Amino acid sequence: MTISDSIKNILLLKNNNNKNNDNNKIENDNYDVIICSHKINSKNEEIPPTDDDTTTNGGGSLNKYVRKPTNQMCRENVEKTFKEDPILQFIIKEMMKLGCLPPVITCEPCDSLDALGSFTPKKGVIICDNMPTFPLNIRNTVVHEFVHAYDMCKNKLNPFNCEHLACTEIRAANLSGDCKWQLEALKKNFGVFNHQAECAKRRAIGSLQSNPNCKDVAEMAVNKVWEKCNKDYYPFSNIPRI
């Protein structure tokens, strides 16, 4: 089953339960700006390249989980996420209630060596297939980018407004599993207390710093929207567990 087949099956399932979507207008944005790029944004999150299928060094780090990047591995894990992940399926369901089709998703090489994925209104979600990674990271990247797509659908984000981007980055970090405690510990970002908030803020600032339009105001933009956006888990009632 291809990625597109997985999406089609989900759409058919959701449409059977929500016939009203047929009457909803699906809006297409006429610009192609990268809304957000999911990046490794600190040295503690770097994943070293490997020539082997798996690495076995670093018993207490992410190294032992890392796999050699291939397009097939990317596609298989993206398809698995679409078929099995209830969090992603719920986001898609809620997008369709708003009258938005989920974005197209593809696995392809990315120019940036620290990018895991990105979202643009026209091209959809791109998952980087040339970055050493591991299945859970691919899953989190897919959900992360779909949070951005949901926010674009619901809130009509302005891709040139750094505060808008800061808010969706905070939400994506919270809702995707990026800041799961076990992952943070493996990345050596230790901290028992308030680790979720610290991780979400760090990742949001890092993402904005990689955006040429926002790099000089990244921390200010995140701090300005922090109180509101860090408590915004919609369409969930709280941070979902993975």
Curated annotation (Swiss-Prot):
Any one GO BP annotation for this protein: mitochondrial proton-transporting ATP synthase complex assembly
GO cellular component: mitochondrion
InterPro entries reported in the protein's UniProt record: Peptidase_M76_ATP23
Keyword tags: Hydrolase, Metal-binding, Metalloprotease, Protease
One Pfam family this sequence matches: Peptidase_M76
Single annotated GO MF: metalloendopeptidase activity
Active site (catalytic residues): 145
Taxonomy, superkingdom: Eukaryota
PROSITE patterns membership: ZINC_PROTEASE (PS00142)
Binding residues for a divalent metal cation: 144, 148
Annotated EC: 3.4.24.-
Family membership: Belongs to the peptidase M76 family.
Protein known as: Mitochondrial inner membrane protease ATP23 homolog
